[in-house]
Amino acid sequence: MSRVGKMPVAIPNGVDVTITEEQISVKGSGGTLSVAQNRLVKIVNKDGKLSFEPADESREANAMSGTIRQLVNNMVVGVSKGFEKKLNLIGVGYKAQASGAKLNLAVGYSHPVNFDMPAGITVATPTPTEIVIKGADRQRVGQLAAEIRAVRPPEPYKGKGIRYSDEKVTIKETKKK
């Protein structure tokens, strides 16, 4: 059996988990998230913990038990604590400004780059060179951060661009004659 799938998911106070034939829904202070139920995984809710077991002994069922367990765990953590990604802008004149559900970037192009935030995602700019993305859905937070980073990824010679706050950019040496 999958090692990840063997671990139960603890449900904290204030989080409600609803399991139906079609989907698994998690509701908490951060909102409501749901994932499609998989026929290869049996879910048992006892004593405030969810256990995930493969429905049969196939490799696919074993793999899906770990996958569904981690998706449900991410939903439980998301609706209770939330997820956040931090981005830094490095470069002369590079700046970001968040206004409501919009993010405006000035990153060296002849035009500003605008992003509309999807529902359930908030963005803040504590400083003009720092972006903080928060939300309950881990996948959407990470995907939005990746899309913003893709506007101007860090270049290898000077390190200018948009990078994750914990990202290390290896600087290359320039060619010598």
From Swiss-Prot:
Give the matching InterPro entries: Ribosomal_uL6-like, Ribosomal_uL6-like_a/b-dom_sf, Ribosomal_uL6_a/b-dom, Ribosomal_uL6_bac-type, Ribosomal_uL6_CS
Q: Any idea which UniProt keywords this protein has?
A: Ribonucleoprotein, Ribosomal protein, RNA-binding, rRNA-binding
Q: Which Gene3D superfamilies match?
A: Ribosomal protein L6, alpha-beta domain
**What is the protein's quaternary organization?**
Part of the 50S ribosomal subunit.
In UniProt terms, what function does this protein have? This protein binds to the 23S rRNA, and is important in its secondary structure. It is located near the subunit interface in the base of the L7/L12 stalk, and near the tRNA binding site of the peptidyltransferase center.
NCBIfam families tied to this protein:
L6_bact
Q: What is this protein called?
A: Large ribosomal subunit protein uL6
Lineage runs: Bacteria, Pseudomonadati, Pseudomonadota, Betaproteobacteria, Burkholderiales
